Each structure stands twice: as C-alpha cells, then as structure tokens.
Swiss-Prot record:
One of its GO terms (biological process) is DNA recombination. It holds the Pfam family RecO_N. The lineage of its organism: Bacteria, Bacillati, Bacillota, Bacilli, Bacillales. This is DNA repair protein RecO. InterPro entries: ARFGAP/RecO (IPR037278), DNA_rep/recomb_RecO_N (IPR022572), NA-bd_OB-fold (IPR012340), RecO (IPR003717), RecO_C (IPR042242).
C-alpha cells in the first residue's frame, strides 16, 4: 500500500553498506520506521533527505512491519541545526527523548507538536540545550515519573526563596530549614528550581521569549539528566557525544 505522510525524522541508523533505517514521527504522532534503500549513495538523492530533523512529505510502501521509503518531498532540512555540533547534539537529545518515550504503536499528537515547536525555536536562535530541557520536562510522565520543584518534599514549605536543592532521598525539592535531613541533596540555585517549575507547567504555546542565563541552563540540564538516570534508568546516546565534546574543550 502506498502511503503519504508528513513527518520529521527523529532517528536514522546506518544499515549495511548502502542502506539506512529511519524513523519518522508523523503528523498524527505515530512513529513510523522505514527502510531507505541505497540512502547512503549520493546518486540516489536520498542521502540529504534522510538526515535527522528533515521535515517533509514521506512517500513509502507498507504492507506488514517496516515500510520501504520511495521518496521525500522536503519541506525543511533544518540546516541551522546541522551547522554547530553542540546545537545538533542537543537537538538530537530532544529527538531521542521523544523517540524513546514512545512504544511501538503509541499515538502521541502532542509529541509531534512538541518536536515541531522545539526545532523551530532552536532554528530561531533559542538555546538548543534549553529546548532539550523543555522536552525532558514535558516527557517525564511518559517515562513513568514526575518531579516537584516548587515545595519542600519534607515540610511542604512552598516559599520559593527557601528552596535550595533537590533531594533524591525525599524525591523532591528541599528547603534550607530541612537541608540537614539529606546531606546528599543536590544543591541548586533558587532561580533554577523556580524556572524548572515554570517550564514544567507552562504550555508550549505560551513559551514566547526564552532568555535564560547559561549557568542556570547548565544546572537545569544536569539535574534533569540525574532525574532520568535515577527514576527511569535512562542514559542517552546524544548526551554521551555532548560529554565528549565538553571533555575536548577542557
């Protein structure tokens, strides 16, 4: 059966000497794996069209199991995402988070909206690292956990100025008054906790200007990755590349 669907490539894996297996997140919010034959060969014209983040109309044959890609009518290559290794890596982290949050057969229209929003924001100049944080905050429930950043998990104190870190012992933010009860709590700036709470709750269509200091973004990114490791056992391939890039700069 010949299928035509708009979508965004969220995963691309080399298969053999000349083929690729790509996964698109289609406009309905479903993951569609496709075999792209000879996609690594320049002459086929599919090499550029099967890169990560390509948004287009995908035409493919599907009977049972994996479909076979025929052609792609590209709407956007998202070139700006490919021009900087850090930008590309954090955009990949966002895409990987969404891809791994979905099981085969899941339909999640919101994930498609989230991915489109994030890629457009990154292309317009918003920090790719910050947008990866937004994605990971929005996808937490799909990985089976949540996190609270606006009240002390020990006392219930919701005075934002009193919150000084995150406690894995008590599974939530912790206030300075209760800090002695968890000496291993991760110390975070009050602003980091506040912005994590805001970004977690704010609908994406209300996120207009996102100008946050880099030190705060770094703190948010670090604690989010810790939450995913602790509560979901998740390690991201994209983050490994980011860590390697950071080590090279030291």
């Amino acid at each position: 059966m010949l299928m035509r669907q708009k979508g965004i490539i969220i995963k691309a894996v080399d298969y053999g000497e000349s083929d690729k297996i790509i996964t698109i997140l289609n406009e309905h919010g479903a993951k569609v794996p496709l075999m792209a034959r000879r996609a690594k060969k320049v002459k086929t014209g599919l090499q550029a069209q099967t890169q990560l983040f390509v948004y287009g109309l995908f035409i493919y044959n599907q009977w049972r199991g994996m479909g076979t890609l025929n052609s792609v009518d590209v709407i956007s290559q998202h070139y700006k995402l490919q021009m900087d290794l850090y930008v590309s890596s954090y955009a990949s982290l966002a895409a990987e988070t969404i891809e791994r949050s979905m099981d085969e057969g899941d339909i999640a229209p919101y994930n498609y909206q989230l991915l489109q929003f994030v890629l457009e924001k990154i292309e317009s100049g918003t920090s790719a690292q910050l947008m990866s944080v937004v994605v990971m905050l929005k996808c937490m429930k799909r990985f089976g956990f949540t996190a609270s950043f606006n009240r002390c998990a020990v006392s219930g104190n919701d005075t934002q100025a009193d919150l000084i870190g995150y406690s894995f012992k008590f599974d939530g933010a912790i206030s300075r008054q209760e800090a002695s009860k968890d000496v291993h709590a991760v110390i975070l700036s009050n602003k980091t906790l506040y912005l994590l709470d805001v970004l977690q709750k704010l609908p994406i269509d209300k996120m207009n200007s996102l100008n946050i200091h880099q030190e705060i973004i770094d703190e948010m990114s670090e604690i989010i990755l810790m939450l995913y490791r602790e509560y979901a056992g998740m390690f991201f391939k994209s983050q490994k590349l980011i860590n390697q890039l950071k080590r090279l700069e030291q």
